[in-house]
Amino acid sequence: MESFVAMKVVCITVLFVIVAVNESATSEANTSNAAKDTKKTNVTLQFPNYIPNPKQLALKLLEICKNNKSSLNSLTARSSTNYYAINDKYVDFKYYTFLCKHDKDRNVTLNMPPDTPCGPNGQKCANKSQCVGHIPGC
């Protein structure tokens, strides 16, 4: 009888291991699919209408974010992983800043380039007092 119980325990343990391995493989597949999705060209950016080329601005901000990460890595002993990201929800056209994510737990607020439009009448971030920002729903 004891061997029967021991055999049940072993079978249940093996079953849990199989399920855990399968779940891990599924999670890795979903992660790689999510990474592939970010490279698609049909991403809709939520920038104001006065931004003539949202994708170009996003790429410029991403480059600034990347360069900032590189300079921080040269000043510190932190790992030099290639992770950096921006989120169009955290681009502030009134205060000409954007949030740059360096690691999953490390963010920094950076300034947008001075030639970035920050208002519907051709205002640029170089003259910060004229920036109007983006009002949702307008």
Swiss-Prot record:
Annotated spans, CD4-binding: 119-138
Keyword Transit peptide assigned: no
Residues glycosylated per entry: 30, 42, 68, 107, 127
Signal peptide (residue range): 1-21
Tissues expressing this chain: Expressed in salivary glands.
One annotated Gene Ontology cellular component of this protein: extracellular region
Disulphide connectivity of cysteines: none
Keyword Signal annotated: yes
Induction section of the entry: By feeding. By the presence of Borrelia burgdorferi.
Keyword annotations from UniProtKB, A to Z: Glycoprotein, Secreted, Signal
Family annotation (Pfam families): Salp15
Compartmental location: Secreted
Domain of life, source organism: Eukaryota
InterPro entries: Salp15
Job description of the protein: Salivary tick protein that downregulates host immune system by binding to both dendritic cells, and CD4(+) T cells. Specifically binds to the CD4 coreceptor on T cells. This interaction prevents the activation of the Src kinase, Lck, and its downstream substrate Zap-70, and results in deficient activation of PLCgamma1, the repression of calcium fluxes triggered by T-cell antigen receptor (TCR) ligation, and a subsequent reduction in interleukin-2 production.
Assembly: Interacts with host CD4. Interacts with host DC-SIGN (CD209). Interacts with Borrelia outer surface protein C (OspC).
Similarity comment text for this entry: Belongs to the salp15 family.
Protein name: Salivary protein 15 Iper-3
Organism per entry: Ixodes persulcatus
